[in-house]
Amino acid sequence: MKLFIILGALNAMMAVGTGAFGAHGLQGKISDHYLSVWEKATTYQMYHGLALLIIGVISGTTSINVNWAGWLIFAGIIFFSGSLYILVLTQIKVLGAITPIGGVLFIIGWIMLIIATFKFAG
């Protein structure tokens, strides 16, 4: 599905931009703890952006589970990385409670990708 290739490329691009912003724009302006949180958000956004690219390439199959995996991983990026970015910029600690939702969405997305692979290979 071309949409996942686009979403993956956009997220990878944004991860590069947010990583550069963290390294150059936030350095010395926030604590080391929050800088580490920012870096974690950037890293996970990049990994899962690449996952979306892969899903986009393999989603030419008829397996609906591959598409579900893509949407779950995309939602995971929004909840996980998005909540961490906002947490760092606002330092509203309650936003940290949203982050695990993104982590769970990532995990379910990866499980759906595994299931789709077994169904396609089987």
UniProtKB/Swiss-Prot annotation:
Keywords for this protein: Cell membrane, Membrane, Transmembrane, Transmembrane helix
Record InterPro entries: DUF423 (IPR006696)
Superkingdom of origin organism: Bacteria
Topology relative to the membrane: Multi-pass membrane protein
Short name of one Pfam family: DUF423
Subcellular location: Cell membrane
One Gene Ontology cellular component: plasma membrane
Residues spanning the membrane: 3-23, 46-66, 69-89, 98-118
PANTHER family, A to Z: TRANSMEMBRANE PROTEIN 256 (PTHR43461:SF1)
Family: Belongs to the UPF0382 family.
Stated name of the protein: UPF0382 membrane protein SAOUHSC_00567
Species assigned in the record: Staphylococcus aureus (strain NCTC 8325 / PS 47)
